[in-house]
């Protein structure tokens, strides 16, 4: 992912509608970024805002969270917005924890809910 800043977008199943609405409402700010997203989340974002530059990776449970983690560790992802569903058990919970751990280790900005994402996005430089 050469050139430009990269933002990762992920949403658990129960939060995908929220992520689509977030993308639609913030398309002007998001249009300044290269976006990587897990498969289904990326599809929902593109449906909501087809003009965004979104690269879809694998679905989270099929390795997408790990792909984004790898991009964080190589410095290719500059910020993470991850709408987490804390009320639904996730079979790939260990992948989610590893992803969050990498965002912390590599000290990139990370929002885990809509309220934080709304505050964070305008402060980021694309």
From Swiss-Prot:
Biological process, per Gene Ontology: methylglyoxal biosynthetic process
Catalysis performed (reactions): dihydroxyacetone phosphate = methylglyoxal + phosphate
E.C. number: 4.2.3.3
HAMAP family: Methylglyoxal_synth (MF_00549)
Binding-site positions, substrate: 12, 16, 38-41, 59-60, 92
Physiological role: Catalyzes the formation of methylglyoxal from dihydroxyacetone phosphate.
Protein name from the UniProt record: Methylglyoxal synthase
Organism listed in the record: Rhizobium etli (strain CIAT 652)
Pfam families linked: MGS
GO cellular component, one term: cytosol
């Amino acid at each position: 992912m050469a050139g430009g800043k990269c933002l990762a977008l992920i949403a658990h199943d129960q939060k995908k509608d929220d992520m689509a609405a977030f993308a639609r409402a913030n398309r002007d700010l998001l249009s300044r970024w290269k976006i990587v997203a897990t498969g289904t989340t990326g599809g929902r974002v593109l449906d909501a805002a087809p003009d965004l530059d979104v690269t879809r990776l694998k679905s989270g449970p099929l390795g997408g969270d790990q792909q984004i983690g790898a991009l964080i560790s190589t410095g290719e992802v500059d910020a993470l917005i991850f709408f987490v569903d804390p009320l639904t058990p996730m079979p790939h919970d260990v992948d989610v924890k590893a992803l969050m751990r990498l965002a912390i280790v590599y000290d990139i900005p990370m929002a885990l809910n809509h309220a934080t994402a709304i505050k964070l996005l305008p402060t980021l430089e694309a």
